Amino acid sequence: MQHELMDNHDFLAFTLAHPHGIAQRFSFELGQHTQVEVWDTGVIAFLPKEKYTAQAPKQVILSCAVHGNETAPIEICNRLITELLTEKVQAKHRTLFLIGNPPAIHNQTRFIEENMNRLFSGAHSKGEGLTHAERIRAKALEDYVAEFYLGAPSNEQRIHYDLHTAIRPSKHEKFAIYPYRPGRAYSGEQIMFLAACGVDTILFHHEPTTTFSYYSSEQFNADAFTVELGKVMPFGQNDMSRFEQTQTMLTKLVSGEALGLSAFSAEKVNLYKVCRSINKRFEDFAFNFADQAENFSAFTKGEVLATEGGEQVLVEQPQEAIVFPNAKVPVGQRTVLCLVPAPNENIR
């Protein structure tokens, strides 16, 4: 299998050729400097053979394709993996890449049976249990994160960027969700790293969730984010020039280059916090705004956001912006997040 991968240095092609798994793990060396380990389909680790002393050591996870039709993050990760495999770039920090849902990539759909980004932190085993491939894969991805982070000292910085693109356009093209982390300050350095990636808008979440980034944050104290890099497009239709900042900064991060970050400044980024999550209670749930409304569209107090079960869902704050509206989710799941400005968060 090593020859299959190294013939063209295309880990995405290798993954899609084995969407449901590989027979066994394999590993090999790059030069005298890096141990490469393929743990599963879509799971590849680059492990430097010597500890990098020019910077504090980091443990970096880059994940994509938790939703199979979000292609730009897949292309970003695959390009970096190819540069590592061809030794154009050398990993100085331990780095794990995760291509989340290969069958959904084949299917060109967000998921096959169930939204995988609602299946972490043990949600995969609740209710019906491990009854289909996406639940089984979510559990496996958790296990790979645990294996990776626990393979290095716990006092080293742990980072996890779960890369996505959004279903609809956005007033802020690139934004990131900072998972709920009670008792821990938010990292100004991480916010400025994301800003250097072109991600100039941060949402502070207000409660535990079952997303991949929350799992890494809550279980391993990782600096973890769900990073939205634009709008969903099919393979071949992404304008990759729009992701050059992201590609450059992720490459610098993995390769140990100086990041050259500015000091944290709230004036350089847009900061929001989630004020509430509206879950679907009835099948007739319907939004009161246009289907094409952009993420971060704003509404004023008293406006009708949605109707369901004969009741109106009203804007409660002086102004609320919305992200991720989706009326088609199953009853009980989130239909939209409502946001307010967040000028006074605990950022250090």
Swiss-Prot record:
Catalytic reaction equation(s): N-succinyl-L-glutamate + H2O = L-glutamate + succinate
Domain of life the protein comes from: Bacteria
GO BP: arginine catabolic process to glutamate; arginine catabolic process to succinate
Required cofactor names: Zn(2+)
GO MF: hydrolase activity, acting on ester bonds; succinylglutamate desuccinylase activity; zinc ion binding
Record-annotated active site: 228
Pathway annotation from the record: Amino-acid degradation; L-arginine degradation via AST pathway; L-glutamate and succinate from L-arginine: step 5/5
Hydrolase in keyword set: yes
InterPro entries found in the cross-reference section: AspA/AstE_fam (IPR050178), AstE_AspA_cat (IPR055438), Aste_AspA_hybrid_dom (IPR007036), SuccinylGlu_desuccinylase (IPR016681)
Entry's EC annotation: 3.5.1.96
Keywords carried by this UniProt record: Arginine metabolism, Hydrolase, Metal-binding, Zinc
Record: residues binding Zn(2+): 67, 70, 164
Cofactor note: Binds 1 zinc ion per subunit.
Function comment: Transforms N(2)-succinylglutamate into succinate and glutamate.
PANTHER family found in the cross-reference section: ASPARTOACYLASE, SUCCINYLGLUTAMATE DESUCCINYLASE
Descriptive protein name: Succinylglutamate desuccinylase
Record organism: Shewanella denitrificans (strain OS217 / ATCC BAA-1090 / DSM 15013)
Gene name for this UniProt entry: astE
